Amino acid sequence: MSVTDFSIQIKEGTKKSHSAAENTSFVASFLRGVVNKESYRTLITDLYYVYSAMEEEIDELQDHPIVGHINLSDLNRVESLEKDLRYYYGPIWRSLIDPSESCTQYVNRIREVAKDNPILLVGHHYTRYLGDLSGGQILKGIAKKALKLEGNHGLAFYEFDNIPDAKAYKACYKGILNHLDLDQKQVDAIIEEANYAFKLNMDMFNSLEGNWFQSLLQIFISSIFKKK
């Protein structure tokens, strides 16, 4: 049995959370083109840990009757994030990064559901990957301009080299969701988890807001002293 309108249910069921995530101070500032390199590379670092956990767990569950269907290598982000981290931190980037506390909580949740109730990974997968695919090119343009980047350096995260038509791919992805062998109770649980995934993302963004504000304050104070 499959719930043929699952893709509609999860979209409608996460609308409020989606809107709330977009309205965190950090994301709102990012969308206005107000972002500094330090906060951005911290974001990339946290996303690296999140995607590493998600892709590792989903790969481990490739034979799972539900999770196996969302093991879509075209969407994988870890390799792209590694390129960006190398750009922002240099060749020894692995020794220079650590996850934030909110990121660690996010990663722990991914590991937990993978072990205890793997179908909930569908909610996490939907929350991150479909969002990346939907807004990737817009965010890429904003980041490129705000950070004054040349070419595509530092922007690999937004590149989906194996997906030439994002709109068509999203339609295919929604079709996969609609054909998963789930009952309504399971669908409801996945939607609840997707909303929790949005909260975990918001917690990460809110921690970045502190970094962003601190950097802005430092610039402001520096400019005052220069004027003196």
Residue ranges and their predicted role:
Residues 1-228:
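Metal- and O2-centered redox machinery and metal/ROS homeostasis
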